[in-house]
Amino acid sequence: MGSAPAQIPTSFGHELRACLRCRLVKTYDQFRDAGCENCPFFKMEEDHERIVEVTTPNFNGIISVMDPSRSWAARWLRIGKFAPGCYTLAVSEPLPEEMQHLCQEERVQYVLPKRM
C-alpha cells in the first residue's frame, strides 16, 4: 500500500464516495478511472458496478493526509500505511460479505465500522 499519492477529489459535494475498506474519498469518476490506490484488488476501474458495491456516499467528515506515516491523525484513524490523500473519518455501512471474503483471500485487513 501506498507511498504514491492518491488522487485528490476534483469536486466536493454529492459526487464524493468513500471506499468502504480504507475510507479513501474520491469522486465516482475518479474511482472509475483509477480505482482505489489502497485496494487495487477490488479492480474498480475494470468493473464499474463494483464501485457502487465497495464505496458509499454516506460518510462523516473528511481529512487530508499528506504524510500518513508521520501523521498522528492518520495513525489514530488507522490509515498510517495508506497512500496520501483525502479520507473520511467514518463510514457507517460494512463492506458486502463477498468483498470481505475477497479481503481475506488477498490477506488484507478489513475492520468493520464502529456503530455511530
Curated annotation (Swiss-Prot):
It is found in: Nucleus. The keyword Glycoprotein does not apply. GO terms for molecular function: zinc ion binding. Keywords: Activator, Metal-binding, Nucleus, Repressor, Transcription, Transcription regulation, Zinc, Zinc-finger. GO terms for cellular component: nucleus. A zinc finger (C4-type) spans 19-39. GO terms for biological process: regulation of DNA-templated transcription; transcription elongation-coupled chromatin remodeling. InterPro entries: RPABC4/Spt4, Spt4, Spt4/RpoE2_Znf, Spt4_sf. It comes from the Eukaryota. CDD domains: Spt4. Belongs to the SPT4 family. May regulate transcription elongation by RNA polymerase II. May enhance transcriptional pausing at sites proximal to the promoter, which may in turn facilitate the assembly of an elongation competent RNA polymerase II complex. This is Transcription elongation factor SPT4 homolog 2.
